[in-house]
Amino acid sequence: MSEILELEAESRTEFGTGAARALRRAGRVPAIIYGAGKTPVSISLEEKEITKYYRKPAFISQLINLTIDKKKYKVLPKAVELHPVTDIVRHVDFVFLEEKTQKMEVPVVYEGKERALGVKRGGYFNIVKRRVTLLCDVNNIPRNITIDVTNMPMATSLKSSKIELPKGCSFVTKKEFVLATIIGRRGAKTEAEGEQQAAEAGK
């Protein structure tokens, strides 16, 4: 589960390009919170702080307690606009979390893909899904889904039905899908082919 990040923001009442530029000159970033049937709230954040957190892994799935004028709101980042040269955060969209569950796009980490059995036999680890869409309990949103693929053999597919998700999470789609495959390069042998050749050599 993601740790809850604590951030402070200030409400803002001036809008438009000129107001946004003035905020950025003052070292602050314009942002907005919307969703859950609520009236959108325009805020500003401290630029260095939000940029620091954005550069950490999986910021877009980070659960945040956002304090605005002494009131706390549970939010999730939705979209981040960056400066095209410096990669400093220029604007952030957040969504309010009021429901018990939230649809999330979460990164997939394939642990041990370089050491997978099929790769050792000359295969190529092909990533089909780098992110998956989950329905998660808002208090149990994972930063990522980590899958150990070290025992994955040649010519096989890793399917969603075989993935154990964190408690409180499920795939949005009920239809089975493929996350990754190990495909053979020319000259690579599957386990069965290797055993057959070894048996023939021993005759």
UniProtKB/Swiss-Prot annotation:
One of its GO terms (molecular function) is 5S rRNA binding. Keywords: Ribonucleoprotein, Ribosomal protein, RNA-binding, rRNA-binding. One of its GO terms (cellular component) is cytosolic large ribosomal subunit. GO terms for biological process: translation. It comes from the Bacteria. This is one of the proteins that binds to the 5S RNA in the ribosome where it forms part of the central protuberance. Part of the 50S ribosomal subunit; part of the 5S rRNA/L5/L18/L25 subcomplex. Contacts the 5S rRNA. Binds to the 5S rRNA independently of L5 and L18. PANTHER family: RIBOSOMAL PROTEIN L25/GLN-TRNA SYNTHETASE, ANTI-CODON-BINDING DOMAIN-CONTAINING PROTEIN, RIBOSOMAL PROTEIN L25_GLN-TRNA SYNTHETASE, ANTI-CODON-BINDING DOMAIN-CONTAINING PROTEIN. Belongs to the bacterial ribosomal protein bL25 family. CTC subfamily. This is Large ribosomal subunit protein bL25. It comes from Rickettsia africae (strain ESF-5).
